[in-house]
């Protein structure tokens, strides 16, 4: 979102605001304080529909899921009226929606007030919010090629996912400098493992189990997430070439750029950041998330020979399959180069600029101010 805002600011003196749910409020305010403290961050009450891929209807009727869903349905109604009053007061020329449950009440309020909607869908499988709002949208940007979506072609454009400018290909010399900066041996290969901001317990446990195998061939940097950091710290001793960190607050692009191979979940933005880096990647998708969107994200790149996939089912049978796959790739310069080159074909360095153009074009077509 910040990348798109940055491009919008280049085109004129626009009044920009960012709306999010309460859970993301503190993080959003911190991000926008660094980017532009004049952009207000407003909080919208919202609720989500808990759906688990591959689970039965009976599973979803369990009180631990049913009651929170009913409660959050009420939150959506509250968020709708909250959004309605805020929009009646502000009357923006266009609303840019990035998906997620907080966008649903905002989108329906905008529809009622006839305020144009522009959507962006990062995942190869459209989320429920975007599927519900897409009939009302004036334009839609997608993170993956259009063949993975059912959006009307006259509305949709494949723009990619806006990523920060520091995600770009690095030279071998630059990567060695980054390894040295991070405290690793510049002459050894480096494996970076990340499960996203909250970490990924299944990936963490697999890496701990195969740590010795990996360290015999490469340096290893595990970004565990805050929840499991202390537990993993107790399970592992200090070793040359081993680094454990809960979270990378600044410089994630440099960490990923330094890596010779990255192991990650299938979050859409993370994958496009790695594509922008032309980074050889092994994806371990979370198969239980809503709609199976991580499985579908991963398949896009697997089909293009741009990444390798290891399923959680495979890990459950034998963690060593991950070690064999990582080491096998590291030992083949041809495979490393092939994966990086193929992944790089998905990079869209102008995604933020293209998305900003779509937003401004929508405003002009609706006869609103330029």
Whereabouts are the PLM-identified features?
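Active-site-proximal region of nucleotide-activated glycan assembly enzymes
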Residues: 38-39, 111-173, 184, 303
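Glycosyltransferases and closely related glycan-assembly transferases
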Residues: 33-36, 81-96, 104-118, 131, ...
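Donor-nucleotide binding loops and adjacent catalytic segments primarily
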Residues: 13, 19, 24, 53, ...
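C-terminal alpha-helical cap of glycosyltransferases
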Residues: 348-370
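A short, well-ordered alpha-helix in the C-terminal region of glycosyltransferases
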Residues: 180, 328, 335-349
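An amphipathic, basic-hydrophobic alpha-helix
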Residues: 55-94, 112
